[in-house]
């Protein structure tokens, strides 16, 4: 193994070190003009075995390093530790014969990020209604994408997932969301809305804009405790939306003490009574031959994939996952990890993901699009890949209204419904 080791943790003494490193990107720093001091870095060692991984972990422990995450996903193994003021995440990927070590410079560990609590409230997942173009088009007043999921946890805090496009948030819609957050948490109008975490699947505007607008309007009445995502380095790839940086600025300006978690495959943590497992990030697509770029043609494949478990029932959160991610996982992932009780249909029903939906085989499907958008002639066959596993007609469209679903011994069940609030964009901005 050569000596081109740039990370600040001890280097493994096995295998071959790939040339260079993969810049996995920062959290809230603006990287439009180049690298930042917050960037996470990953180095890759190949031609290694599980015995090599075990030896490296043991050597770290001999040095007094205390790991805070040690687990496996199928044949893959993960070890996370703190060393010299930074956090490190080690992945051993068995089918590739690789060990990947990621250095996080500016964030908390997944152990310190999460918390466990069992309150008295019924935990409920809402697919929050957004307005979609009725003809599945994109105009100056409408879009055919965007999504927002809200999970009210048992301690009456909220976890938000993505946020919708600015063109889905006219003033009526934004006020409707604000009133909805008060209603489901039974918070008085002059009270504080507690958001335990806001998760963003990837760096597209139809997944971040609504957060920016909500924080601009109501940050004085919102307690935002945590933010979690993994966006790649801007310099490695096209496809970023510039308004994503407005979201970053809003969070850093109004919530400088919010805990930030850079997501990595293998992490597992709790938010109150919900357990989150990270099954994929864009880091998994990096190759030893080309660490200096994102090896994905479609930026949507930088979407992280999470599996959430609440009261024993699971939901697979796919973001805008596309076929490149599916092909990578088909080659390297343990398929048994993917079975779930509910699935968020990927990328607004724009992609064929029949293989992935077969692994998941979810009897409940939540669709981040309208019924009309999902049933456009070009989308019907894409929907069918997930729809074939649906039981009791449990397929819910975000454009039809807000659906509230709870975990029960018999699976996820719809228990609440609220009509769509809002319509075409009114150019009210953030």
In which residue ranges do the predicted regions lie?
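Compositionally biased P/S/T/G-rich terminal and signal peptide-adjacent segments
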Residues: 1-42
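Amphipathic alpha-helical segments
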Residues: 47-70
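Core dinuclear metal-dependent hydrolase active-site scaffold
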Residues: 106-193, 262-339, 407-430
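Active-site environment of divalent metal-dependent phosphoester hydrolases
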Residues: 145, 167, 203-209, 233-237, ...
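Structural recognition of the beta-strand scaffold that forms the well-ordered cores
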Residues: 150, 158-162, 194-201, 225-230, ...
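Active-site metal-binding motif and surrounding structural segment of the metallo-beta-lactamase
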Residues: 168-229, 332-350, 361-365
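Metal-dependent catalytic neighborhoods of phosphoester/phosphodiester hydrolases
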Residues: 205-220, 236-247, 355-358, 377-381
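Binuclear metal-ion centers of metallo-dependent hydrolases, dominated by the metallo-beta-lactamase
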Residues: 226, 232-285, 297-298, 364-430
């Amino acid at each position: 193994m050569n000596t081109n080791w740039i990370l600040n943790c001890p280097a493994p003494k096995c295998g071959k070190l790939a040339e260079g490193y993969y810049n996995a990107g920062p959290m809230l720093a603006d990287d439009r003009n180049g690298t930042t001091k917050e960037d996470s870095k990953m180095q890759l060692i190949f031609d290694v075995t599980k015995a090599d991984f075990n030896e490296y972990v043991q050597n770290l422990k001999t040095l007094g390093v205390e790991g805070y995450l040690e687990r496996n996903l199928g044949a893959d193994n993960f070890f996370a530790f703190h060393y010299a003021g930074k956090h490190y995440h080690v992945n051993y990927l068995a089918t590739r014969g690789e060990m990947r070590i990621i250095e996080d410079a500016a964030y908390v560990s997944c152990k310190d990020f999460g918390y466990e609590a069992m309150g008295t409230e019924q935990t409920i997942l809402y697919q929050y209604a957004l307005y979609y173009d009725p003809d599945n088009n994109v105009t100056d007043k409408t879009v055919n994408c965007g999504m927002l999921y809200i999970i009210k946890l048992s301690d009456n805090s909220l976890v938000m997932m993505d946020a919708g496009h600015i063109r889905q948030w006219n003033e009526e819609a934004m006020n409707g969301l604000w009133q909805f957050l008060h209603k489901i948490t039974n918070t008085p109008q002059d009270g504080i809305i507690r958001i335990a975490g806001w998760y963003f699947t990837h760096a597209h505007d139809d997944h971040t804009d609504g957060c920016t607008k909500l924080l601009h309007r109501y940050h004085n009445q919102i307690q935002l405790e945590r933010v979690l995502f993994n966006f790649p380095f801007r310099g490695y790839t096209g496809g970023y939306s510039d308004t994503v940086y407005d979201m970053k600025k809003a969070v850093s300006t109004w919530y400088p003490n919010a805990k930030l978690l850079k997501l990595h495959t293998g992490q597992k943590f709790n938010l109150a009574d919900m357990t989150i497992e990270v099954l994929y990030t864009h880091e998994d697509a990096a190759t030893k031959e080309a660490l200096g770029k994102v090896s994905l043609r479609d930026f949507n494949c930088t979407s992280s994939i999470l599996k959430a478990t609440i009261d024993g029932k699971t939901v697979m959160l796919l973001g805008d996952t596309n076929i490149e991610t599916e092909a990578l996982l088909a080659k390297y992932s343990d398929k048994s990890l993917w079975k779930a009780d509910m699935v968020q249909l990927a990328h607004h029903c724009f992609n064929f993901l029949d293989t992935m939906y077969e692994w998941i085989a979810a009897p409940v499907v939540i669709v981040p699009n309208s019924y009309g958008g999902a049933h456009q002639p070009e989308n019907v066959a894409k929907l069918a890949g997930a729809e074939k596993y649906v039981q009791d007609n449990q397929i819910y469209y975000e454009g039809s209204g807000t659906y509230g679903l709870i975990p029960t011994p018999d699976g996820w069940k719809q228990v609440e419904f609220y009509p769509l609030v809002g319509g075409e964009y009114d150019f009210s901005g953030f």
